[in-house]
Swiss-Prot record:
GO terms for molecular function: NAD binding; phosphoglycerate dehydrogenase activity. It comes from the Archaea. It catalyses: (2R)-3-phosphoglycerate + NAD(+) = 3-phosphooxypyruvate + NADH + H(+). GO terms for biological process: L-serine biosynthetic process. This is D-3-phosphoglycerate dehydrogenase. It comes from Archaeoglobus fulgidus (strain ATCC 49558 / DSM 4304 / JCM 9628 / NBRC 100126 / VC-16). Signal peptide: none annotated. The gene is serA. Keywords: Amino-acid biosynthesis, NAD, Oxidoreductase, Serine biosynthesis.
Amino acid sequence: MKVLVAEPISEEAIDYMRKNGLEVEVKTGMSREELIREVPKYEAIVVRSQTKVDAEVIQAAKNLKIIGRAGVGVDNIDINAATQRGIVVVNAPGGNTISTAEHAIALMLAAARKIPQADRSVKEGKWERKKFMGIELRGKTAGVIGLGRVGFEVAKRCKALEMNVLAYDPFVSKERAEQIGVKLVDFDTLLASSDVITVHVPRTKETIGLIGKGQFEKMKDGVIVVNAARGGIVDEAALYEAIKAGKVAAAALDVYEKEPPSPDNPLLKLDNVVTTPHIAASTREAQLNVGMIIAEDIVNMAKGLPVRNAVNLPSIEPSDFEFMMPFLTLAEKMGKIASVRLGGAIRKVKVTCSGKLATKNTEFVTRALLKGLFEPILSNEINLVSAKPVAVERGITIEESKVESVEHYESLLEVWVESNGKEMYLAGTCFGNEYRILKIDVYNVNFVPKGHYIISLHEDKPGVIGRVGTLFGRNNINIAGMIVGRSGDKPGGIQLMLLLVDDPPTPEVLEEMTKLDGIIDATYVEL
């Protein structure tokens, strides 16, 4: 196998591939035109975050079998285009976890003790001991937003500094947090109770602007804010105003809304803002780890062995691939619906495969369901390979069973998801390549889960659906389809309504819908 290393990775990773018989060529710093010209020669390519492997590059890569991203985020790779070409995309989750966690702690200490400012002062020939009075972290309360891999390691290190640690993560169990003596609280409690707030969530549609003007107003006076996750999660304009108003005593940032930040960014002009140029993962150890993780997967691919960190394709017997793929899609869609509807820490997942489906290797059906459950909160950090280990990490109980025969259908997939005392049931099947959800809880629905859906419970009485239609019409939202399921044959109970809309509703419209007479709840999910 011929491998193109398009961005710097560790020499150890390059040597490992060569020792395993791969022909490796290192060509860093290529222009886009050079990459398109060179890539047809290779069966594997390794990139980091700068090289864009988009549809045009993939189209040019006639012989490409695998794309390795030496890092976690895959925003620079067109996953759909790669999948359509049968190209496996692998990344390196966890390879830079410790480095990122340590950097967050370093930023926290630097802000608390004003280390960069004091360093600059001494180098200017000054001796301003009183000016740089700091605070101890011992005994203070750290608020960790996001208790995934990095957040978990940050919380452990805060405990080692003898801090009290609160965490907000609606998708992590209380038992998981208690393993390291961390108390799970709601978002507002964390904001109001923390002396230091550190952010460790991925950048998704839901987390952009997670900490804005309203959230700063709920914080303690004199709070320290640290962001070593992704730019845009902390609203920079709101942060600037909070610092100027004295609400925030100091901030420490490794990531920015625009990178590199503009020299005119007002945060860069504040003396109590510590900044670094997105280097949380830039350690020798992290680069060795991510390089080796990618190198091992490329070697496995060359030897015909399973890869460990595939982002896009599971390992399924070629003869079963066409039959299984729609069920993987169905399971993932079910997971997304359950995640959005339940909206809390998942405790238990049960999967039952019946009929012809039960005769296949259904391991990836469960993994696809878990991927769907986690995707709304973990974004590109989750894939079919990592989904099950992440579930185990989070203390989720997984039960899998098979039933040989089933009535009415060739195959049936049933899932039960439990969260904070609530349970959701979904059942579905596939007809060729078409996947359909047949039942949600006690409601018969039968629909194709694809597009923008609003799922709502409402009282079964005249006028409710009409009021929803009026609201949507007033807000120029077109309803493309509607399914209403009753819990029984008689009117007067509770109905489940599925609305397929052409465009996603704004949060304001969704909130207004929940206030309509007869509406019990409403959630939006993109399927």
